[in-house]
Amino acid sequence: DFDPVIDNALDAGNPIPEALQSRAELRQKVRNCADFKPLPAEIRSLFPSEFEETELGWVPKGWSFTALKNFGKIICGKTPTKSNKNYYGKDFLFIKIPDMHGKVFVTNSHDKLSKLGSESQSNKIIPHGSICVSCIATVGLVSINAQDCHTNQQINSIVPNSPHYRNYLYFSMLEKYKIFHDLASGGSATLNMNTSVFSNIATLMPNNLVLKQFHKITEPWFEAILLNEYKLTSLASLRDTLLPKLISGELSLEDLPDLNTDTEAA
């Protein structure tokens, strides 16, 4: 969103590139509305008042396009051999595409690795707070791992060089859904975006002050989402424990006094 830069350029009387003229005109109409509320001065001061041209188009002065790998280490997941059952257990999440659907944060996974399984591919461990992107078959799902984990080979993960890159990268990857699909369409029936292609995707790099402020503003939202996700995981676990016992008759509602109390109160 270049609106703060356009605002600054308009106020400073700086020229707007022809390619951005239509956006500037729309922005000016918004600014002329009676109920227009400008961004706080301290936020606008983080943005430049000029644009500069790059090979990939116009960007705010001081910003640039760079390969995704320059934001952090890219790790392609791997599946430990199934022939060694000791590699699987309950110590580490082993994230696969079904675990990512509808999740901003992944807090649980259907399969898990043991400590031994993790150690068998220690170079594939994904530190918590990384951005996981599905790149084979179902392409373009984006999630954040809530704890150190592993993924299978259908997922590439970005380990941010700095914690304040995380939230920006999450939204940036969501916006690249169509780009991911275009890059993964190689003529075969199955979509496949390999790690090399993924690592070199051009990604807009704002200045560091903007990235830090963006993280500061958005982090409370992410913290609330993560807390809710843990609550949902806990409730799902409780459901999966109690429901079979209720269906089989091993338990009845009378055996759950807290539930009865809550129901009566409602």
Language model features by range: what are they?
Residues 1-4, 9, 13, 75-79, ...:
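A generic secondary-structure signal for well-formed alpha-helical elements
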Residues 1-54, 252-265:
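Intrinsic disorder at enzyme termini
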Residues 20, 29, 36-39, 44, ...:
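Low-complexity, Lys/Gly-biased intrinsically disordered segments
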Residues 41-78, 210-213, 219-255:
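Non-catalytic DNA-recognition/assembly elements of restriction-modification systems
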Residues 49-50, 108-117:
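Short, structured beta-strand/loop micro-motifs enriched in basic residues and often containing a Trp
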Residues 67-75, 101-111, 122-128, 141-225:
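Basic, amphipathic alpha-helical recognition segments used for DNA target recognition
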Residues 133-134:
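A generic structural signal for residues embedded in beta-strands
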